[in-house]
From Swiss-Prot:
Keywords: Activator, Cell cycle, Differentiation, DNA-binding, Nucleus, Phosphoprotein, Transcription, Transcription regulation, Tumor suppressor. It comes from Homo sapiens. Residues 10-21 have a biased composition (Basic residues). Transmembrane segments: none annotated. Residues 1-24, 93-120 are annotated as: Disordered. Its main location: nucleus. It is found in: Nucleus. This is cAMP-responsive element-binding protein-like 2. One of its GO terms (molecular function) is DNA-binding transcription factor activity, RNA polymerase II-specific. The lineage of its organism: Eukaryota, Metazoa, Chordata, Craniata, Vertebrata.
Length: 120
């Protein structure tokens, strides 16, 4: 007796179950693979460019911080010798001027708000 079954007018032979893979166009599959590889290489190139830019910007930041640290070391050595560096004097006088400007502007604003509050 034959093990094949008739279902819907078609003869099914026993064997693997499930969908049978359709005939794959090998040229199309190869082209898709090549395209995917091209896209992968392009993404990799962009990623490496981004990382290189990130590294160079961090290196520039490190150099700037080293210069700033060296400047602060020089200031500390000068202050240990009893000298006040001119940069620190400029910073201090600049802060004093800013404080005096802020205080004068606060008094001016306070005067305006008091005048406005008493006008009703």
């Amino acid at each position: 007796m034959d093990d094949s079954k008739v279902v819907g007018g078609k003869v099914k032979k026993p064997g693997k179950r499930g969908r049978k893979p359709a005939k794959i166009d090998l040229k199309a599959k190869l082209e898709r693979s090549r395209q995917s590889a091209r896209e992968c290489r392009a993404r990799k190139k962009l990623r490496y460019q981004y990382l290189e830019e990130l590294v160079s910007s961090r290196e520039r930041a490190i150099c700037a911080l080293r210069e700033e640290l060296e400047m602060y070391k020089q200031w500390c050595m000068a202050m240990d010798q009893g000298k006040i560096p001119s940069e620190i004097k400029a910073l201090l006088t600049g802060e004093e001027q800013n404080k005096s400007q802020q205080n004068s502007s606060r008094h001016t604003k306070a005067g305006k708000t008091d005048a406005n509050s008493n006008s009703w």
